[in-house]
């Protein structure tokens, strides 16, 4: 009877772990945060090339959008810990109509900003895209010409 109980408990544990695997986990090379999956791509691309690359990965995938300090902290840790020397990293924020109206590429609400001191400064009236600023440990943002080449973070909702 004792052996039957151990086997039954083992089967129950296996069933529960399999029933929890509903495809709501991020792939192995992606990180999970607040219901989304993120992955840093070290290839250097313009902002638009990076956004198009993310969109081609899967439906609903875009450059990352950040909506709270905890989002910034998780991504900063991920980049700093796994991709030392990546440089600045594109996120999905952009001023599409050049009126200093910032919008996320995934069309989520723009309710949070983490600008570096003195930013956005729109140097030479040509800084309409946003990256995570490397010297801040990837916690602060800087506006940059969209044609600059940087690694980037893609994101999709679970």
From Swiss-Prot:
Expressed by the venom gland. It comes from Pseudoferania polylepis. Ca(2+) binds at residues 127, 142-143. Residues 33-155 form the C-type lectin domain. Residues 1-23 form the signal peptide. It comes from the Eukaryota. Belongs to the true venom lectin family. The keyword Signal applies. Gene3D superfamilies: Mannose-Binding Protein A, subunit A. It is found in: Secreted. InterPro entries: C-type_lectin-like (IPR001304), C-type_lectin-like/link_sf (IPR016186), C-type_lectin/snaclec_domain (IPR050111), C-type_lectin_CS (IPR018378), CTDL_fold (IPR016187). Disulfide bonds join 26-37, 54-154, 129-146. This is C-type lection lectoxin-Enh3. Keywords: Calcium, Disulfide bond, Hemagglutinin, Lectin, Metal-binding, Secreted, Signal, Toxin. The keyword Disulfide bond applies. GO terms for molecular function: carbohydrate binding; metal ion binding; toxin activity. Mannose-binding lectin which recognizes specific carbohydrate structures and agglutinates a variety of animal cells by binding to cell-surface glycoproteins and glycolipids. May be a calcium-dependent lectin. A motif (Mannose-binding) lies at residues 119-121.
């Amino acid at each position: 009877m004792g052996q039957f109980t151990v086997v039954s408990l083992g089967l129950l544990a296996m069933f529960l772990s399999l029933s929890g695997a509903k495809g709501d986990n991020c792939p192995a090379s992606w990180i999970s945060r607040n219901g989304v999956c993120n992955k840093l791509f070290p290839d250097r691309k313009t902002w638009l090339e990076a956004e198009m690359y993310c969109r081609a990965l899967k439906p609903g995938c875009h450059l990352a959008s950040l909506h709270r300090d905890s989002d910034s902290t998780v991504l900063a840790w991920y980049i700093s810990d796994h991709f030392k020397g990546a440089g600045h990293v594109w996120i999905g924020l952009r001023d599409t109509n050049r009126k200093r109206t910032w919008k996320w590429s995934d069309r989520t609400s723009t309710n949070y900003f983490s600008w570096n001191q003195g930013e956005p400064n729109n140097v030479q009236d040509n800084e309409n895209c946003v990256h995570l600023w490397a010297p801040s440990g990837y916690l602060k943002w800087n506006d940059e010409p969209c044609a600059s080449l940087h690694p980037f973070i893609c994101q999709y909702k679970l």
